Amino acid sequence: MKILNALIIGTAAAALLAAADARAEWPEKPIQFIIPFGAGGGADIEGRLIAKAMSAILGQPVVPINKPGGGGAITYTFVKNSKPDGYTVAWNSTSILTTTNIGNVPFEYTALDHIGQVAQQPVPFVVRKDARWNTLKEFMDECKAKPNTLKVAFAGFGSATHVAGVAMTQLSGCKAIMLPVKGPDRRKMILSGETDAAVDIFFVPLKFVKAGKMKFLAISSGKRDPATPDVPTAKELGLDMEFDLFRGLSVAKGTPQAIKDKLESAMIKAANSKAFAGRMKKLKLTLAPMGQAAFKAKLAKANANIVAIMKNAGIYRSKMKK
C-alpha cells in the first residue's frame, strides 16, 4: 500500500511539474488573435497592429482571425468556449459589455478572463460635411419632428456604436431608422447619402473630417478629445451618457495565471513599443495600457455605467438572472 501511495503521489507530482513546465515554456505555437469585427474596420486595423507587435515580443506568430457577428457575440462565445491555454485570445472592446447586456449572448462579461487594455477612444456621431445639421440638437430636433425618417448607421447590434447611437437618439426623444452596416460601408453610405448619419469608430472617419468631407456633431466620452477640441460631448449637450470605446485582450476563463501574466506583459510592451505607440499617435487614438487588476476595476465601473445607459434608453436585455 505504501508503494502504491508513493507511486500515486509521484505521478501526481510529475503531472504538476509537467504542467508548470508547459506554462513556463508558453507559447510554443502560434496564438489565434480573434477580432470581433470585419476586415477594414477600426477594430481590425488596431488589432492587426497590436498582434504584429506582440508576435515580435512572444517569439511566436499572433495570427489575426476575423469572426464578426452579433456585435462581438461570435468572437466572445468562441473564445469563452476555447481551451483555457492562452492560444486563443479575443481582441476585446466595449462590445464585451454592450453585447452581453443587450442579450446577444447568454453570459456576462465575467465569463471570460480579461488581460488588460491597450487604448481607448470616443464614439462620434458623424454626418456629411455639407449636411444641413451643424449641431446634434438640429439633427435630433428634425428627427423628433419627422420620426422614422432619418437613418443612422452603426457597426452591429450590441456593438458600442449601436449602444451609443441608440442612447443618443432615444435620450434625445428621436426615433431614427437604425442600420447595422460594416465599417467601410458606413463611410461610403454617409458620403453617398444612403444614410443621414453614423455612429462610428473615432479615428476612421476623423480622416474624412480632416479632409473636409464629414463632420462630428458630438462624441460619447466624458470629456472633449484633443484631436477634435471643438466637438462637444453628449453629456455637455444634456444627454445622460458617458463612455469610451476601449480595446484590450481577453481569454477563456481558467487560463493559468502564469500565462495571463505573460500575455499582459507582452501586451503592455507591444502597446508601448515605438512602432505601435507611434501609429496610435498618428491615428489620434489615446494609448492607455493597463494590466489585469486595473482593467478589472475599469470593466466593473464601465459595466455599471453601460447598464444604466441601456436601461435609461430602454435597450437593456441581459439574459442573466440578477
What are these regions (language model features)?
Residues 1-9:
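Bacterial N-terminal signal peptides that target proteins for export
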Residues 10-12, 22:
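Cleavable N-terminal signal peptides
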Residues 17-21:
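N-terminal signal peptide c-region/cleavage motif recognized by signal peptidases
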Residues 23-111, 148-149, 161, 170-201, ...:
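N-terminal (or domain-start) structured segment
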Residues 28-30, 171, 257-322:
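An extracytoplasmic/periplasmic, membrane-proximal ligand-sensing/linker region
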Residues 40, 94, 128-133, 154-159, ...:
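Short coil/turn segments
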Residues 54, 78-87, 100-185, 244-279:
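Hinge/capping helix and adjacent helix->loop/strand transition within the periplasmic-binding protein
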Residues 118-124, 218-253:
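Periplasmic-binding protein-like
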